Amino acid sequence: MNTEAKRIAVSGAAGQIAYSLLFRIAQGDLLGEDQPVILQLLDLPQAYGAVQGVVMELQDCAFPLLKEIQVATDPHAAFLNADYAFLVGSKPRTKGMERRDLLAENAAIFRTQGRALNEAASRDVKVLVVGNPANTNASILRRFAPDLPDDAISAMIRLDHNRAVSMLAQRCNVDVDSIADMVVWGNHSPTMFPDYRHARIGRRLVKDLINDENWYRESFIPKVAQRGTAIIEARGASSAASAANAAIDQMRDWIFGSDGRWVSMSVPSDGSYGIAPGLMFGVPVICDGGRYERVKDIGIDAFARQRIDLSVRELQEEADVVNRLFADR
């Protein structure tokens, strides 16, 4: 067993996604069965009691890998020397809330957390933004954590990737691990573009096996994009366990590598595929050695261009709102 514990910060620690996430991290699903961990939990002061309840449950599991649990209401304390951070907490959109107001509240949260990460976290920290609007929240975080490496912050789009892979596997009647080279482009929102034009089962292209363009455009894409809404309607609450699972999948591949597989991550654009540089955007990557490399030179047809541009416009509009918010202060 490795003797030095890794420090893992989790914000929104009293929430349902964190509740599904923390126990899996503590039992080794993220870093493996020989890596001790210290959990550094962050939430609002009014959630302190609920977080203590989670702490008691974690203690009662007697996880051998869990060496310490720290609870903080101050981001600087929660992120101190963190090796990995899952930023799950964010301000959810409530009934009647204007988009500008939602972005304003999250801008304040992620400005504070960005500064705290910049000052306190390990210089090799990997930060995954889960709380929505995840792409724009991650962009705000980068803005206020300028001393961290350019590739230190990612936003989660793996949940959409996993949903797409699962739906394709069901359609083709194969195991999910048979599906390779699936891509989800763009924002974690209904404008996302789940793209199976290059996905394979063995050497065969999924699009040739399905051979149904109408299903692709009119059923598959909207079903992936609206899956979260369907879950809320079915269970009366948003995705929690599947979101936590996707967060672990994305971070684990980022840390240990994706074995040559394409996976989808929202990362700062380098200008490829006509996506504005710096925009936090879902793209295909291959992870290796603790880093990710963008998959280049994928063919973009007219339909794909239209779908990608839709997400680009949405994220640029959100960025414009945020820029005006900060200019006003």
UniProtKB/Swiss-Prot annotation:
Record keywords, A-Z: NAD, Oxidoreductase, Tricarboxylic acid cycle
Query: Might you name a Gene Ontology BP term for this protein?
Result: malate metabolic process
Binding site residues for NAD(+): G12, A13, A14, G15, Q16, I17, A18, N106, Q113, V130, G131, N132
The EC number(s) attached to this protein equal 1.1.1.37
Q: Tell me the GO molecular function terms.
A: L-malate dehydrogenase (NAD+) activity
Q: Which reaction does it catalyse?
A: (S)-malate + NAD(+) = oxaloacetate + NADH + H(+)
User: What residues make up the catalytic site?
Assistant: H188
Keyword NAD present in the record's keywords: the answer is yes
Residues where substrate binds:
R93, R99, N132, R163
Task: Relate the protein's function as given in its record.
Answer: Catalyzes the reversible oxidation of malate to oxaloacetate.
The text of the family note is: Belongs to the LDH/MDH superfamily. MDH type 2 family.
**What PANTHER family does this protein's entry cite?**
MALATE DEHYDROGENASE
Listed name of the protein: Malate dehydrogenase 2
Q: What is the lineage of its organism?
A: Bacteria, Pseudomonadati, Pseudomonadota, Betaproteobacteria, Burkholderiales
